[in-house]
Amino acid sequence: MSNKRTTTKDESLPQAEKEAVIPDEIFQMTADEVNRKAKLLENETKVLRSEHISKHLEMDSIQKRIKENNDKLQVNTQLPHLVANVVEIIDMVLDGETQPSKCVVVKASTRQTIFLAYPGIVDVDKLRPGDLVGINKDSYIILDTLPPEYDSRVKAMEIDEKPTEEYSDIGGLDKQIQELVEAVVLPMTHKERFESIGIKPPKGVLMYGPPGTGKTLLARACAAQTNSTYLKLAGPQLVQMFIGDGAKLVRDAFALAKEKGPTIIFIDELDAIGTKRFDSEVSGDREVQRTMLELLNQLDGFSSDANIKVIAATNRIDILDPALLRSGRLDRKIEFPLPNEEARAHILQIHSRKMNVSADVNFDELARSSEDFNGAQLKAVCVEAGMIALRRGGTELIHNDFVEGCVEVMAKKKKTLEYYA
């Protein structure tokens, strides 16, 4: 009777479900074998259930430890950190290990040198000697990498506002503009043209000439045309009181230029640090010479096809050290003479184009009457003419205003200019 009931119950199930629920081998077993099989499955289920529970407990324990470690990490990574420099990275086999691992030696700002067998939470492969890192003040493990440090005086040399000067703002310097474009602008904007010919562009340019002839103005216009970072260094700024301070400024300036590239470094008044070397027992003279040697080293330290160009300006090329002028450093020398008559007329027109000028102003005659004027003095003529027109209550500048302006500037102009190193 029981067999009939079982068969009836089995026939009421779908064929696929019946095969999934009861394997064929079960029907070939005796009742004792079925009971024994059921007990084995029940024991196996209990074992799996206990393993499942233990795994859950183990997972909860791991999650708890992860949370505790994250909390500790968050506490330990809170500022402030100690600042340290990476001194050395060592590959060595630690106790209990078979494979070599990377260890780090750091020098903290507290003047301690620390060996870290386990560096910390940063990627050691990305660390380099000299890198700046933040370390925990208690365990000294490395928590973060810091950006490179530059002298604050060097950062102040970077001109944040992009130069707005254009070549059209410069008069009488067409040849000089062409030479500067070939030496500085083209290598930065059309590098492939030099590569196709197979020549290397010059590293730097030396502009020399009397004051007020447009050297700084042309350097700013050049930086504006290349859309590059513009670092302006003055020679007297690099002469510092402490030994090695000026050389560090030069070193940091070139390091900042490499990071911010493409960059134009403009060194004004180069004769302040670039004078010919001589024997001296005065420590100040030796420090100036050390600064110049660092400048020579930095000029040799980057290739001519790098995105760094050096433009130097001086009034006294005759007192510069020959090592600065040799090929491979400041290759191109561009002279800025006093403007001729045609150039003076062009400069006067440029500086007066935004003024309300009468049509009877003869710039050619003004150019003839302003012989030996430089560009800055010609600009002063236009300013003086405007002040004279204001003084007489006029609304536009007439020719006589410019003539009186020339007389005013001529009266202030020194007859002889002497420069001392």
Curated annotation (Swiss-Prot):
GO cellular component annotations of the record: nucleus; phagocytic vesicle; proteasome regulatory particle, base subcomplex
Family: Belongs to the AAA ATPase family.
InterPro entries documented for this protein: 26S_Proteasome_ATPase (IPR050221), AAA+_ATPase (IPR003593), AAA_lid_3 (IPR041569), ATPase_AAA_core (IPR003959), ATPase_AAA_CS (IPR003960), NA-bd_OB-fold (IPR012340), P-loop_NTPase (IPR027417), Prot_ATP_ID_OB_2nd (IPR032501)
Database matches in PROSITE patterns: AAA
GO molecular function, one term: ATP hydrolysis activity
Quaternary structure (record): May form a heterodimer with a related family member.
UniProt keywords, alphabetically: ATP-binding, Cytoplasm, Nucleotide-binding, Nucleus, Proteasome
Compartments reported by the entry: Cytoplasm; Nucleus
Superkingdom of origin organism: Eukaryota
Role summary: The 26S proteasome is involved in the ATP-dependent degradation of ubiquitinated proteins. The regulatory (or ATPase) complex confers ATP dependency and substrate specificity to the 26S complex.
Pfam families given in the database record: AAA (PF00004), AAA_lid_3 (PF17862), Prot_ATP_ID_OB_C (PF16450)
Chief localisation class: cytoplasm
Protein name: 26S proteasome regulatory subunit 6A homolog
Record has ATP-binding as a keyword: yes
Disulphide bridges: none
Residues making up the signal peptide according to the UniProt record: none
Binding site for ATP: 209-216
Family annotation (SMART domains): AAA (SM00382)
GO biological process terms, semicolon-separated: proteasome-mediated ubiquitin-dependent protein catabolic process
Encoding gene, per UniProt annotation: psmC3
